[in-house]
Structure formats: structure tokens, C-alpha cells
Amino acid sequence: YNRIVWNNIEYINFKKDESEFNSEEYLINSLNPQTGFGFCHMKLFNKKTINNVRFNQKLQVGEDALFNEEISLNITKAIYIGKQLYNYRVNEKSVVRKFDANYVDKYLKAIQVNKMFVMQNYGEEQNIKINYYNYVAYHVLLIAVNYCNHAENIEKNNDSLKKVCNIEEFKEGIRKSNYKNISLTRKITLFTIKHKM
């Protein structure tokens, strides 16, 4: 797709070739935010795949990832096509880009619901679980940038990040993550958090 921020157009292509995925591969890709699969945009779903799955109205963040995780149970085949099919406009002043004092709580709730789903449906599958922990660690890094170090955060310091890293769900994700499917800069940051917080 084309991502448009103000007047700048950036073509986003996560993979160059067409690819076919089974249910597990789709779920693993959905749990890795840097693949782009966890978002609900960029997709066309067969109505039978969606079935009775709906967005969780109790979540304010992460509801799209949970939706993708839940429909993965109904997927027999997913096909990726590396073509620009639409324009995705980014609103730089949107609500998700503003400082939110409840940011950590919103992500914690989403992580708790995600964990419950993954453990109930894939608790014995190590490959799924490690990707879930990587998903959690990735979101701790988002919290570090968008909350702990946000210019409007009055607690803006390492203490804020330490508090976040000591929340059990986040601590577990950091500890059990394996650096897979994240960029080098995020790997370095995650390594620092794992060994210094």
C-alpha cells in the first residue's frame, strides 16, 4: 500500500513475492508487528473466515491484533500479494499519536487478553508462544517511546520505564522474547532493557 503522511508518499511492501500461509503461519506473522500482518487494514477476508469474530469493544488498543489472532483459527489459507492496492493516510494529529496518561494500562489490558487467547488455544505450541512473547516485548518498546519518553510525561525518566518493565506481563515478555522478527535498532534496545532493567 502507499502510506501518505501529509503530502509525502511512501510505498510500503512487507514482502516482494506472493506468498501463501496456513493458519499457524498467519498467526505467527500477526504476532510480529513489524510484518504488518497484525493490522486489519491491507486485507480482504472471506466472510466465512470472520464468522462470529468481532473486535473486542473492551480494548482501546490491540483490538486489531486480537481480531487477527482470533480469525487465524478459521483460516485454512491466506495469500499475500505484494502490490499497492490503496492509499493509507496517516493523520499526524490523531488520538493515538497524542500523549495518554493511561497508555500503559490500555496496553496492559490488551496484552492480558492476548495472552489468555494464545495460552488457551496454543499453550503447548512453543513456536506460537515465543512469537507472543516477542509481541509483548515489541509493545514494551512502544511504551518506552510513546509513553515513558514522551515530552508530555511528567515522569519522563528511567524510573517510568523501570515501573513498566516490572509489571509481570511485560517482565515475562521481555524475559522470554528472543529478538526474532524485530529490527536491529529494536534488538539493541530490547537487549538493554533485558539486561539493565
Roles of regions detected by a PLM:
Residues 79-81, 173:
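General small-molecule cofactor/ligand-binding pocket signal
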